[in-house]
Design a protein with these regions (language model features):
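Thiamine diphosphate
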Residues: 1-121, 184-188, 195
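Short coil/turn connectors at secondary-structure junctions
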Residues: 14, 40-44, 78-83, 106-111, ...
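Glycine-rich beta-alpha junction loops
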Residues: 50-52, 117-119, 175, 203-211
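Short, hinge-like loop/turn segments at secondary-structure boundaries
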Residues: 63-65, 103, 128-132, 218-221
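Conserved thiamine diphosphate
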Residues: 80, 128-195
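Active-site-proximal loop->helix
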Residues: 97-102, 122-136
Length: 247
């Protein structure tokens, strides 16, 4: 009998600390499936920051290092390795905004996996830079008021304006078709790194049932009904498409 699905070899066979319904497990699997398919586990280095994914070094089979809060994409060494950072919105879009922007201006040849769940997960559900207008959090109990808290940051749209960005794409994991599309995007990002095209950033709209106060099923519906309308899915920059159009 043909094997149509198996546990990724580069994803360690251990229990994770993630909450039930959290999207990190899905994204971890997708990243590791791509690493396995490309046969690059021995040449891959992951960088994880402060946040819910801080213990991902226990789950990825490749080499993984930790970075101070927000500093994961501050990378310049080992150009022969496949390097990816795995960051949340409180990390990448808040304290790490400078590093995020300048990794794009420098065109560093790395992959950034950006998990957008509109909240600070590890610290208890405070407002994040990506929290939706009107969304209730621990620090916005009456909903995010844009007059006092400003507007959410649309990272992909911002990163697409930078010359060193090769790929900026937003995906989601609220449905099987969207999960498949997310894997394709992650694969393309790693292929870009292999071809040394520059920075590839994949933003993943994900869930945080615990801090949202929802069930896993309700959380997936929230992504579909609330997050995707505000953060439209799609490719915001793709240098390979631009090169093809010029050919």
């Amino acid at each position: 009998m043909a094997v149509v699905f198996d546990h990724p070899k580069s994803l360690l066979d251990v229990s994770t600390h993630f909450c039930p319904g959290c999207g990190h497990g899905i994204v971890h699997r997708l990243v590791c499936e791509v690493i396995d398919e490309m046969g690059i586990e021995g040449d891959t280095i992951g960088v994880v920051p402060v946040g819910c994914s801080v213990m991902s070094y226990n789950y990825f089979g490749c080499d993984v290092i930790e970075a101070p809060h927000g500093r994961a994409p501050a990378k310049r060494t080992n150009p022969d390795k496949f390097v990816f950072s795995y960051q949340g919105d409180g990390d990448l879009a808040a304290i790490g905004t400078a590093e995020t922007v300048h990794v794009g201006t420098r065109g560093e040849n790395i992959v950034v996996i950006f998990i957008n769940n509109t909240t600070y997960g590890m610290t208890g559900g405070q407002m994040a830079p990506t929290t939706l207008p009107g969304q209730v959090t621990q620090t916005t109990p009456f909903g995010r008021n844009v007059e006092t808290a400003g507007y959410p940051i649309r990272i992909c749209e911002m990163m697409a304006t930078l010359s060193g960005t090769a790929l900026a794409q937003r995906v989601a994991i609220d449905s099987v078709p969207h999960i498949r599309e997310a894997k394709k995007a992650i694969r393309k990002a790693f292929e870009n790194e292999k071809a040394k095209r520059g920075l590839s950033i994949i933003e993943v709209l994900s869930t945080c049932p615990t801090n949202w106060g929802m069930s896993p099923t309700e959380s997936m519906q929230f992504v579909k009904d609330k997050m995707i309308p505000y953060y439209p899915l799609g490719v915001y920059k793709d240098v390979t498409a631009e090169e093809g159009a010029k050919a």
